[in-house]
Amino acid sequence: MKKIFIIAAMAVAGISTANAQEFKVGAKAGFLMSNVSVDSSSDIEAGKLITSKLNTAFRPGFHFGAFIEYGFNEKIWVEAGVDYAFQGAKLKSVEGTVINVSDGSLIVSKKANIKNGSLKTQQFNIPLWVKYDISGFRPKVGVNLGFLSKVKENLEIEGAPAVQNTINESLTPDKKFDFGLGFGAEYNLDSGLFFDATFNLGLTDLSNKQKVVLNQSGGVARTVEPQTFKNRVIQIGVGYKF
């Protein structure tokens, strides 16, 4: 009987240890490069098709957060976390064209460079991952739920009139929810230290529709579709799991 109790106690201890190892919590921080995917905007006014395009580039930022991880077995793991990220994009130039709708002829085409241009955003992210372990190396795929908290725009358009060539303002975003797909990988050391790299492909259009007055004397206003933009974020981080 004594042997049975000893074996049972050892089994319970083994199960408890295994279960304890299935759940892990951790924290991480790191560097990121972010950009926004921008589509052209267009409008028709007085028989003219007016299009504009904003050209952007990646800008550096950083992120930090915490997470919980669960292992169904030695291979399959899932993770849910909370991350705060400083994202955005560099604003490089703006291009515009005016085309005659009746015959398709080009009336004017111009490009203006942007000096010291930046779009700075701060965002809460909830990344959800599914991972597969290969001797500590874990490829992962998932989704990212983002909540935009702050937006600031800085730019100076070269060659524009002095009264309207500079913008430096903080914006209150009307669209705050951002949904995206995540792809990445991490490498785990036995000590609990790990390194990871991820890419977030934003699918949500974060621009806003706005009404502009095209004929002030007649009081005519209509809604114009602005340029759409979606997040593109590369993150590289280091963290520790407990």
Predicted regions and their residues:
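Bacterial Sec-dependent N-terminal signal peptides
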Residues: M1-K28, V238-F242
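Outer-membrane beta-barrel channels and translocator barrels
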Residues: A20, N73-K75, I134-F137, D190
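Start-of-domain marker
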Residues: E22-W77
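Residues on the lipid-exposed face of transmembrane beta-strands in outer-membrane beta-barrel proteins
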Residues: A27-F31, F62-F72, V82-Y84, I126-Y132, ...
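Extracellular/periplasm-exposed beta-strand and loop segments of Gram-negative cell-envelope proteins
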Residues: N35-R59, F86-Q122, L148-D178, T204-Q235
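Short Gly/Pro-enriched loop/turn and capping motifs at secondary-structure junctions
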Residues: P60, G192, N200-T204
